[in-house]
């Protein structure tokens, strides 16, 4: 990739984050996951916990600081995280509306960058004209 293009991409990413677009998208994705995807995830998590409670009846009598790591281990051994991430990737992150929001944000930043560069060129040319 050309060095100038790489610098422009890096600048674009930096501006995207600095202007709050990344945080806004992250919140939007989290809201979508909470609204649409959390039900099946919580049901599956509850099933894993119930199965672990059946396997080890002493979990109910243990304090939460001892029981929580055991249950977390059961969740880790399941494919809950991987399946959830794959589901989110294929159903939430690939959503066309989300892609349009990202594209429009990047496009706006790019337009602002071009306008800024044009202003700098104009100022530089005026400065150079004044020196001649």
Curated annotation (Swiss-Prot):
It is found in: Nucleus; Cytoplasm. InterPro entries: BOD1/SHG1_dom. It comes from Schizosaccharomyces pombe (strain 972 / ATCC 24843) (Fission yeast). Belongs to the SHG1 family. Component of the Set1 complex composed of ash2, sdc1, set1, shg1, spp1, swd1, swd2 and swd3. Transmembrane segments: none annotated. Its main location: nucleus. GO terms for cellular component: chromatin; cytosol; nucleus; Set1C/COMPASS complex. This is Set1 complex component shg1.
């Amino acid at each position: 990739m050309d060095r100038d293009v790489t610098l422009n991409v890096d600048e674009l990413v930096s501006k995207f984050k600095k202007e709050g677009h990344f945080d806004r998208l992250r919140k939007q994705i989290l809201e979508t996951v909470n609204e649409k995807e959390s039900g099946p995830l919580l049901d599956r998590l509850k099933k894993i916990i119930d199965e672990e409670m059946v396997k080890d009846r002493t979990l109910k009598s243990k304090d939460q600081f001892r029981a929580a790591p055991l249950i977390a281990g059961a969740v880790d051994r399941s494919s809950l995280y991987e399946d959830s991430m794959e589901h989110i990737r294929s159903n939430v992150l690939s959503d066309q509306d989300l892609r349009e929001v990202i594209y429009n944000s990047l496009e706006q930043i790019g337009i602002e960058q071009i306008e800024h560069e044009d202003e700098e060129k104009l100022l530089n040319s005026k400065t150079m004209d004044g020196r001649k």
